[in-house]
Amino acid sequence: MIQKNKRIAIVILNYNGLNLLKKFLPSVVNFSDEKISSIYVIDNCSTDNSIPYIKRKFSNVKVICHKKNLGYSSGYNKGLKLIKSDYYILLNSDVEVSKGWLGPLFKLMESDKNIAACQPKILSYKNKTKFEYAGAAGGFVDMLGYPFCRGRIFDTIEEDRGQYDNKTQIFWASGCCLMIRSKIFHNCKGFDNSFFAHMEEIDLCW
């Protein structure tokens, strides 16, 4: 059954991530504007009591359960068909969001219909003065086809000194925290299911 939603569906894919949910889901619940967003967890047939925990602790978080582990791409593709919303934010289960995180993303997408997808600046959880390897400040592809990010090239991670606070066009937005228009996601037929995990967001944005 398709679930009616608010303007934004914040969607977390989970597989046996109980410890991560305990650590990071509270920030998503506490700092996401309920007026414009709903929170979903798509579960890939977890066996670690993830779902009972969510239902017990977060009654406002909606849960979609798969009958087997479909991986990242197929897990999202199948689950998102059941969620009706203008925008999806695909959020990794190990991401801590901060107060006010949602507003700038929503404002940007609303301001320009030509923007298909976007991401925020993503900082390391363990060292918040540095960028996170997965996505940093936006993704690009070099002339040989290798992906890199503003703030991270190969294993070199930059310190965040505000050098990438400006809005700019990027080649790909990180699946760590990817906001995309739902219509575009479905028109592109979602992620390529041949990507079980990793690199699928680059393929989608391409």
Where are these regions (language model features)?
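A short, conserved alpha-helix in the catalytic core of glycosyltransferases
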Residues: 171-206
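Conserved donor NDP-sugar-binding/catalytic core segment of glycosyltransferases
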Residues: 96-146
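Glycine-rich, basic loop-to-helix element that forms the pyrophosphate-binding segment
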Residues: 65-83, 93
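Short, flexible, basic/aromatic active-site loop/helix in glycosyltransferases
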Residues: 138-170
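Short aromatic/hydrophobic "clamp" motif used to bind/position activated sugar donors
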Residues: 88
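Short, acidic, metal-binding catalytic loop of nucleotide-sugar glycosyltransferases
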Residues: 26-36
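Short beta-strand/loop segment that forms part of the nucleotide-sugar
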Residues: 36-45, 64-66
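A conserved acidic beta->alpha catalytic loop
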Residues: 18, 27, 43-51, 68
